Regions:
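Beta-strand/loop-alpha-helix module characteristic of Rossmann-like adenine-cofactor folds
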Residues: 2-5, 110-112, 118-182
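Class I S-adenosyl-L-methionine
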Residues: 1-10, 15, 20-117, 122
């Protein structure tokens, strides 16, 4: 295989928070596969010479959608040099970047993971809320509020977590707020 896939974090949505490395890779891309959490302003950075492929997934979509995205990454890596898989936030903080990397590796596709600012940090910082503070919070944890529905049981033990960590950042938890807050 001659191509390489870059799993790139686009940051929390503000185009000024995307990394210089991400911009560089977007500008060199032959193909960009992007999801629904990537802002329109960042999508507009994709050069006209690159093929843009929307692979956005919505809440409730089955896993076949992700399988299709995985297949596209391999397919494009076989036929082009630079494939960018552009993901909102950071690709490996609840972004399936780890799963995508495993898939690429299983097909011997070269890949690189490029970090992005996760919304859990970016939104708190913009709001002026310190996730850690020497006087008040010595620990922080990022936890999903929406675990894989195919698991037999919930792994997150909310009551135990609430007693053991100073700051809890819950990602994708709005629809399960009633369960989480008990």
């Amino acid at each position: 295989m001659t191509g390489k896939v870059y799993l790139v974090g686009a940051g929390p949505g503000d185009s000024k928070l995307i990394t210089m490395r991400a911009v560089e890779l977007i500008q060199k891309a032959d193909v960009v596969l992007y999801d629904r959490l990537v802002s329109k302003k960042i999508v507009s950075m994709i050069p006209k010479t690159a093929k843009k492929v929307y692979v956005g997934r919505s809440v409730g979509d089955d896993t076949s959608h992700q399988n299709g995205t995985n297949d596209l990454m391999v397919e494009y890596a076989k036929s082009t040099k630079h494939v960018v898989r552009l993901k909102g936030g950071d690709p490996i903080i609840f972004g399936r970047g780890g799963e995508e990397a495993e898939f690429l590796k299983s097909f011997n596709v070269k890949y690189e993971i490029v970090p992005g600012i996760t919304s859990g940090i970016g939104s708190a910082t913009y709001a002026g809320i310190p996730l850690t503070h020497r006087k008040y919070a010595s620990s922080v944890v990022f936890v999903t509020g929406h675990e894989d529905p195919e698991k037999n049981e919930e792994i997150v033990k909310w009551k135990k977590l609430a007693k053991s960590v100073d700051t809890i950042v819950i990602m994708m938890g709005l629809s399960r707020l009633g369960i989480i807050s008990k």
